[in-house]
């Protein structure tokens, strides 16, 4: 029997003439939750980096999970550069710094980019004109950067000889190379339309042609006088952007266009298999209920269909992920699909009526359904290919809670790793020995644990003080079951 749950709550109701919540309480942050803030995993280790601001600049610290020790790793001095956001290079010897960020659409932005070399403490602008760059990404070997300028062309910047190279030449307001337009940001939540090959030799990118998409007028009221702006907006029955895939061979200076099937109405994803030159791409029809995965054949310049997922309503698929390191697949936000080193595919589908993990051979033939039952898998948290273990989040016990589990590739040894009632999320260390577990419930404010891969709690990393709410006599939500006329 399926239940409908309603949350009945007046969380901020004051009882028995106890303290009342005022606007000042909100503005001065009387109520606050605790977390460990931003952190970046250190490669091949059980440690992560976090930052603290000082009078001199931004200090980076390394926290060791096993020993509970913290040491200062390096600093970026204000005298060198300030007011930036950052991301690490794949080898973690450099930082990509972004200044003057300006919002483009919902997820995308552009800005000025610089590279900070940690060892030499030096800053290099990304090209002689580092402004108005978007979708800037390191190559896997950390020696190059690819990016898109506001002319909607792809460019390459070699960090060894500080040389810039233009890779595409047909970019315009209508032709977008390496960066999706508004439609893909809204439909699929992504703006990134190019991928580096693992050996840094190739770039596969999507070319989006918006020529036949009609414009829609929007009024921007932020300025003193309203400004009319136009976006390419395909209404029902009107033309969508036309998309195509091209591959750039940076070493041999070759360019090829991939022959696509007629069903390639949307191309929501392109994927390089880890540690290989195998390329895959996904297509989706306009109704977004028929998804296909193709493996590209360099000899025939065509894609061979290996997976299909379809239903009568809608296919909800996130992009494939790539591993942080060979053998250990982990990302902070979780993922729904992965093509492993041996070519096997682990992916989440709702084809049996519930969201579950499936395992397929490199040619697409099924091996086994990993999880099953009348419950849902939310996403995959990490994959241990050596020991054939999948860590994932799901709702096996109840729809109103989310827990972290582990299971073998063959579907055996399903184990729940989090015991506390509530909602749990996880981020596994590169070694998969530990995971950071953020947790909260209707009665427990946000709390962060460090756990071993077995689920055993090592220590509390952050805990919200509940007493700050108690003085206001706050009530907590309660769940009740509401039955419909047919008993469901």
List PLM regions with ranges.
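Asp-box/WD-like beta-propeller blade repeats and closely related beta-sheet repeat scaffolds
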Residues: 107-155, 161-193
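Blade-loop segments of beta-propeller domains
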Residues: 68-102, 129-132, 310-313, 323, ...
């Amino acid at each position: 029997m399926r239940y409908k749950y309603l949350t009945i709550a007046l969380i901020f109701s004051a009882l028995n003439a106890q303290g009342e919540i005022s606007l000042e309480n909100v503005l001065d942050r009387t109520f606050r939750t605790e977390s460990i803030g931003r952190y970046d995993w250190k490669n091949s280790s059980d440690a992560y980096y976090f930052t603290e601001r000082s009078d001199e600049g931004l200090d980076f610290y390394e926290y060791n999970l096993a020993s509970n020790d913290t040491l200062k790793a390096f600093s970026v001095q204000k005298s060198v550069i300030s007011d930036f956001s950052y991301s690490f290079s794949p080898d973690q010897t450099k930082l990509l710094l972004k200044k003057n960020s300006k919002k483009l659409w919902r997820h995308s932005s552009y800005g000025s980019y610089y590279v900070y070399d940690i060892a030499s403490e030096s800053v290099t602008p990304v090209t002689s004109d580092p402004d108005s760059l978007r979708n800037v990404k390191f190559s896997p070997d950390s020696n190059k950067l690819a990016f898109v300028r506001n002319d909607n062309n792809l460019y390459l910047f070699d960090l060894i000889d500080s040389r810039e190279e233009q890779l595409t030449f047909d970019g315009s307001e209508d032709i977008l190379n390496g960066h999706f337009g508004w439609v893909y940001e809204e439909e699929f939540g992504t703006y990134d339309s190019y991928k580096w090959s693992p050996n840094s030799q190739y770039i596969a990118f999507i070319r989006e042609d918006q020529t036949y998409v009609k414009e829609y007028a929007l009024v921007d009221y932020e300025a003193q006088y309203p400004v009319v702006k136009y976006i390419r907006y395909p209404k029902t029955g009107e033309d969508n952007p036309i998309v195509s895939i091209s591959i750039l061979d940076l070493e041999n200076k070759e360019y090829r266009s991939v022959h696509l099937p007629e069903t390639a109405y949307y191309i929501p994803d392109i994927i390089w298999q880890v540690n290989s030159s195998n390329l895959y791409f996904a297509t989706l029809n306009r109704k977004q209920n028929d998804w296909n995965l193709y493996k590209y054949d360099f000899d025939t310049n065509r894609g061979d269909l290996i997976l299909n997922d379809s239903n009568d309503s809608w296919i909800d698929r996130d992009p494939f992920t790539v591993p942080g390191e060979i053998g250990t697949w982990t990302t902070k936000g979780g993922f729904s699909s992965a093509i492993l080193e041996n070519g096997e595919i682990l992916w989440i589908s709702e084809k049996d009526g519930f969201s579950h993990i499936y395992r397929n051979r490199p040619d697409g033939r099924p091996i086994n359904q990993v999880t099953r039952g009348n419950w849902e898998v939310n996403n995959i948290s990490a994959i241990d290919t050596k020991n054939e273990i999948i860590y994932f989040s799901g709702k096996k016990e109840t729809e109103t809670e989310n827990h972290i589990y582990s299971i073998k590739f063959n579907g055996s040894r399903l184990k729940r790793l989090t015991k506390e009632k509530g909602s749990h999320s996880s981020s596994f260390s590169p070694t998969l020995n530990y995971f950071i577990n953020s947790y909260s419930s209707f009665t427990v404010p946000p709390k962060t644990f460090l756990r071993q891969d077995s689920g055993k709690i090592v220590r509390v990393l952050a805990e919200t003080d509940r007493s700050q709410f108690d003085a206001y006599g706050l009530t907590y939500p309660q769940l009740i079951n509401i039955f419909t006329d047919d008993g469901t």
